[in-house]
Amino acid sequence: MQQIVILGGGAAGLAAALAAAQSAPAGAVRVTVLDRNPRCGKKLLATGNGRCNLDNTGIAPEQYFTADPAALRPLLAAVDAAAPLEWFAALGLYTRTDEAGRVYPYSNQAADVLALLEGHLTRLGVEVRTGCTVQT
């Protein structure tokens, strides 16, 4: 059995753990998330003033502070902007987009996003250990 350890239980760490667990056949991989905090997702709960700003549909190179906005165009064009929202939809999360293009969970509650991620991690057998420090 292959073992995958994810360091950090923030939004990216939880998403990585979920993706790793989903991509392997059942029983082929053991995924563990290690986080130094007493609970995972602390910053996720604070994002978007507690509403969890998931995405922005109006991203353009001109919105970034850079000497050469044109250099960002091919980078942004290479990103599948719909993929994150499709991923959340596949997990069962309903979203809404406000007039400024910001995407939030339909409930407007970051806690619902965290609960959804944690529920899928539990269902897939991902072990989450909090209060851990990792030394190299």
Enumerate the predicted regions with their spans.
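Conserved beta-strand segments of alpha/beta enzyme cores
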Residues: 30, 94, 125-127
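Short glycine/serine/threonine-rich phosphate/pyrophosphate-binding segments
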Residues: 13-17
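Short beta-strand to alpha-helix junction loop
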Residues: 72-80, 99-119, 129
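Glycine-rich active-site loop/strand segments that organize a redox cofactor
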Residues: 49-99
